[in-house]
Design a protein with these regions (language model features):
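SDR active-site lid
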Residues: 215-306
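Canonical Rossmann dinucleotide-binding motif of NAD(H)/NADP(H)-dependent dehydrogenases/reductases
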Residues: 43-76
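Residue(s) in the substrate-gating loop at a strand-loop-helix junction
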Residues: 186
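Active-site Tyr-X3-Lys motif and surrounding loop/helix of classical short-chain dehydrogenase/reductase
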Residues: 114-121, 140-141, 149-156
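Active-site helix of classical SDR
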Residues: 166, 202
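The beta1-alpha1 cofactor-binding region of Rossmann-like NAD(H)/NADP(H)-dependent oxidoreductases
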Residues: 82-83, 103-115, 148
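Conserved mid-core segment of classical short-chain dehydrogenase/reductases
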Residues: 136-152, 195-198
Length: 322
C-alpha cells in the first residue's frame, strides 16, 4: 500500500471531516465545552502575559515572539543583534501587538539582568522567559583545532546564557508569586552521540538545570523543556563546524537522511517534496520552524495550574535515532 493511502485527504489545512459530520476543529470545540479543557481554539492564556524571548531577532525566536504577540502577549524581544530585535518589536507593534526590545548578549550576566529590569520597569512583571538563544557547533574531537573557539562560545551561550536568563528573572517571578521558564533544549541532550560532545553536553546541562529549577520552585515557577529534533531553517546549521558530525544522530540512517535532504532541499520534484514537507502527511520529514514555534506557544498557552514540563517535537517521518 503506498504511503499516501494512510493519509486522509484534508478538506483544508488542519481540518478533517469525520463520519459524524464534524471536522477536527469542531470536535475540539465540543471536547472543550464538555470537559472545560484548554486545548485548541478555546485556549486564551497568552493574552496579557509579559513574555521575554531571547535570540528573537531572527529565525525560530522571531517566530515565537511574533506568535505570542499576535495572541496578545506583551513581548520583550531580546537578541545580541539589537537592530534585528528592534525590527521584530516594530513588526509586532505594526501588526497591532505590544512589544519592546533590548540588545542583549546572554553570555553577559549584566546584560540579562538589564533585560529583566527593562521588562519590569515597562510592564511591572515577568510572566514567561523563553531561553531560546543557542548555537550548534557539531564537530568531532579530531576537529578540535578548528572547533575550539566555537565550543567555548557554545558553552557560554547554550549553558551560561540559560543560567543567566533564569537568575535574571528568578527573584521577580518568586516575588510576584508565579512565572514560567521555557528552555529550548534538544534531542542531542538525551544521549551521548559522536560528533556532538560539546553541544550535547550543553543541552544535557539545560535539562538538568531545568529539572532542578522545577523541583526548587514548585507552586511558584513552571518549567518547560522543549526538545526539538532537526529543524531546518532556524539558523542553527550555520554554526556547524563539520557537517559529517550529523552521523551521530542519524547513525545507520545516514544514507536515507541524505536522500531525503536531497529531495526536500535540492532536486526533488514538487510532488516528492510535498510528500515530505506536508505536516498533514505521516511521511512529514522535518519540523518547520513555524510548526515548532506553534508548540512553544502551546506550552505557554496553559492555565497557571497546568505545567507541561517536557515536550519532544518530532516529524513523524524523520530519520533521527534518539
Amino acid at each position: 500500500m503506498p504511503p499516501e493511502a494512510w493519509n486522509p485527504k484534508p478538506s483544508g489545512r488542519g481540518r478533517r471531516t469525520r463520519r459524524d459530520g464534524l471536522d477536527n476543529t469542531a470536535l475540539r470545540h465540543r471536547v472543550d465545552s464538555r470537559v472545560g479543557g484548554t486545548i485548541g481554539p478555546m485556549s486564551d492564556h497568552v493574552r496579557g502575559k509579559v513574555i521575554i524571548v531571547t535570540g528573537a531577532a531572527s529565525g525560530f525566536g522571531r517566530l515565537v515572539a511574533e506568535k505570542v504577540g499576535a495572541k496578545g502577549a506583551r513581548v520583550v524581544v531580546a537578541d545580541i543583534d539589537a537592530a534585528g530585535a528592534e525590527s521584530v518589536a516594530a513588526a509586532i507593534r505594526a501588526a497591532g501587538g505590544e512589544a519592546i526590545h533590548r540588545g542583549t548578549d546572554v553570555t553577559d550576566r549584566g546584560d540579562t539582568t538589564g533585560l529583566a529590569a527593562l521588562a519590569v520597569d515597562t510592564y511591572s512583571a515577568i510572566d514567561v522567559l523563553v531561553n531560546n538563544a543557542g548555537i550548534m557547533p557539531l564537530a568531532f574531537f579530531s576537529d578540535h583545532a578548528a572547533a575550539a573557539a566555537a565550543w567555548d562560545r557554545c558553552i557560554d551561550v547554550n549553558l551560561k546564557g540559560v543560567l543567566h536568563g533564569i537568575t535574571a528573572v528568578y527573584d521577580q517571578m518568586i516575588a510576584q508569586g508565579h512565572g514560567h521558564v521555557v528552555n529550548i533544549s534538544s534531542i542531542y541532550g538525551n544521549v551521548p552521540v559522536v560528533g556532538s560532545a560539546v553541544y550535547s553536553a550543553t543541552k544535557a546541562a539545560v535539562n538538568v538545570i531545568s529539572e532542578s529549577l522545577r523541583a526548587e520552585s514548585q507552586g511558584r515557577i513552571k518549567v518547560t523543556v522543549v526538545r526539538p529534533t532537526g529543524v531546518p531553517g532556524t539558523g542553527l546549521g550555520a554554526s556547524i563546524v563539520n557537517g559529517e558530525a550529523l552521523v551521530g544522530l542519524v547513525g545507520q540512517n545516514m544514507e536515507l537522511f541524505r536522500q531525503r535532504a536531497t529531495v526536500v532541499f535540492g532536486a526533488g520534484s514538487p510532488d516528492a517534496k510535498a510528500e515530505f514537507t506536508d505536516p498533514e502527511k505521516i511521511t512529514y520529514w522535518a519540523i518547520s520552524p513555524d510548526e515548532l514555534a506553534a508548540q512553544v506557544v502551546y506550552v505557554i498557552d496553559q492555565p497557571w495550574g497546568v505545567s507541561i514540563s517536557d515536550i519532544t517535537v518530532r516529524a513523524s517521518g524523520e530519520q533521527y535515532l534518539f
